[in-house]
Amino acid sequence: MNDWLHFTAEEKIAAVQLYTTIKDNIADSLAPGDEQLIRRHVLQAIASHQLQRDIFGLNPILMALQTANLASAEIGLKRDGVFAILLYSNILCGFETVDQISDSFGDSVAAILRGLCRIHDLYKKNPVIESENFRNLLLTFAEDMRVILIMIADRVNLMRQIRDTTHEEAKREVSEEASYLYAPLAHKLGLYKLKSELEDLSLKYLEHDAYYMIKEHLNATKRSRDAYIERFIAPIAQKLTEAGLKFHMKGRTKSIHSIWQKMKKQKCDFEGIYDLFAIRIILDSPLDKEKMQCWQTFSIVTDMYQPNPKRLRDWISVPKSNGYECLHITVLGPKNKWVEVQIRTERMDEIAEHGLAAHWRYKGVKSEGGLDNWLASIRAALEAGDDLQVMDQFKMDLAEDEVYVFTPKGDLLKFPQ
């Protein structure tokens, strides 16, 4: 049971620490006996000697623990999603079957594992993912929303771990897939921090010189950028305080990937990008005064600095389908520089930063259940126009009126049903 021969000394320490953290993350969703049961299954898998390191030399148990920690802490998955992550290796190596998992842990965990296995089979059949058809088929196969969330968490974790690998071709394939497939999925689900991390790491691995060129420029201009931000926000802070508003402000440097995209789109060098940062005003507002105080802040900012009305984005009156709420406006600041200002409340900020995890916290949800209304709106966004009205909890039958088939050459084609 305690055979740790697959583990280095550092991995042993990391595994114990991760397991403890995960247990704390999902403690409020565990039933009596759950913790002992999952620990026994994981230890049995280790002792079976059926698990092997992957192409990058990464330990599958440690990877599962890292992914489970990310999924629980940064996305908000609870008992069923986390257990599926920890048990997935057992299924792949044939140590256990999905039916056996169902008997031990319940139908919900088994359903997630079936979804993960279906997508694993899809990858084996057609590993080429550079098509919109593949993305749609992937979503169609994932009938449980948590499958997609786990795949995003798994890819973020993998991208974090392969930094020093010598398998450059495999690293490139993983990075291209992260950029093309998983970053857009994370974006649609409101997981903006994970989306930015996937994009930045992909750029770092695929366009090494461009990534470090931008990073060095950002480091070199940090002092002047910070001084400008202080000059910009000082009069706003004074007016907001005089208005009796509770708030804090911060400057946020835009991601390296987004700066690189602007440079390519505008066909200019780093010095030609004017909006390297955004100012975020975060209000401590009671729920019933959120909209009023956001618009009051908007009025104060635009009275002080000339706005560009074409750059107004109002996601407070009509939030994005993934739950994002914020006012965006671009104004002309000191030295005739355009500055993007984002206005939102503490609640809106946490949702913008943490996506699903924040929604679940604000709803006081202790398990993955009870989120069908919000997840239904996410699903509607992913469906991109389908007329389905009835949405089962966590279901994502995204192409009910379409059929996907493989050609003899392995290409994916989409047809009306």
Predicted features along the sequence, with ranges:
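Short gly/ser-rich anion-binding loops that grip negatively charged ligand groups
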Residues: 57, 103, 124
